[in-house]
Amino acid sequence: MGTSEQVIADLREPTRVLRRAAPGAWAGFATLHDEAMKDGALDAKVKELMALVAAVVKHCDGCIAYHAKAAARQGATSEEVAEALSVALLMDGGPSTTYGPRAFAAFEEFTQQRPAREDPGQPVADGHEVPVAAS
């Protein structure tokens, strides 16, 4: 298991516990996530790249892992991720020289796990594991 996959795995159980403790808030977040990340004027891949940049600027390792994985699943290329991360560097300065490479390494990790797609023009369901309210 790679470093970023381990970040996601480490968050899985604590997230389940918190989701059970505050199901309404988590259900609301899941709805917000689904609405914000669906294809629209911007496709889901572009939105995942935007989220990855935001994760770098916010210095959120868990967010970086989730959105790097989702960007890989959406078919983002290394060139697209590198270009997006240059915007993070512009907006965040020095700290992005640490978090940007983490994000790029996470993307590369998940790209290695990405199965070959028969039709690269078709989007894949995003890899973000949005915790939804448990009944």
Positions of the model-derived regions?
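Acidic, glycine/proline-rich low-complexity segments that act as flexible tails and inter-domain linkers
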Residues: 1-48, 98-135
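Immediate flanking context of iron-sulfur cluster ligation sites
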Residues: 41-58, 79-88, 118
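Amphipathic alpha-helical segments within well-ordered protein domains
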Residues: 33-34, 51, 68-72, 86
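Short cysteine clusters
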Residues: 60-63
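Short Fe-S-cluster ligation motifs
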Residues: 86-103
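Iron-sulfur (Fe-S) cluster-binding segments and ferredoxin-like electron-carrier domains
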Residues: 27, 66-81, 107
